[in-house]
């Protein structure tokens, strides 16, 4: 039985070594990743850098460079920067599962914010993408568990009201 387990673990160990090598190569570049790249690597769009500090507790230190490239400092959430626009993405067929987001989207409240677009994307959970002056995604946040007031308050801080 031990031989069978060893044979099963070898591919997993090889994959871990490959991932560790890739992560080390990325860390040597000191790269920051786009929100899409981070999502593909399995990191949340609202990952805080303080979470990366916990990787050592789980023997996941090889992931640290990528985690640092995908995380946001806590101080970034406290800035009063106004964004040029925002896109609230949600799947129309899933909207009923998120009644608070549904209430916001179907109300007149989105019309109060300059540059806010509601975009229906098949299969998407509710996500808020904040856009810079060039129309590029500057921040991306999951609003899965936000209530209507939280969405409105956050947008009031980040977008210009009409």
Swiss-Prot record:
SUPFAM superfamilies: Thioredoxin-like
Keywords associated with the record: Endoplasmic reticulum, Selenocysteine, Signal
GO biological process: 'de novo' post-translational protein folding; response to lipopolysaccharide; sperm DNA condensation
Expression (tissue specificity): Highest levels in prostate, lower levels in brain, lung, thyroid gland, and large intestine.
Signal peptide: 1-28
Keyword Cell division carried by entry: no
Predominant location category: endoplasmic reticulum
MF annotations from Gene Ontology: oxidoreductase activity; selenium binding; thioredoxin peroxidase activity
Annotated localization: Endoplasmic reticulum lumen
CC per GO annotation: endoplasmic reticulum lumen
Family: Belongs to the selenoprotein M/F family.
Role noted for this protein: May be involved in redox reactions associated with the formation of disulfide bonds. May contribute to the quality control of protein folding in the endoplasmic reticulum. May regulate protein folding by enhancing the catalytic activity of UGGT1/UGCGL1 and UGGT2/UGCGL2.
Subunit structure: Forms a tight complex with UGGT1/UGCGL1. Interacts with UGGT2/UGCGL2. Interacts with RDH11.
Name of the protein this chain belongs to: Selenoprotein F
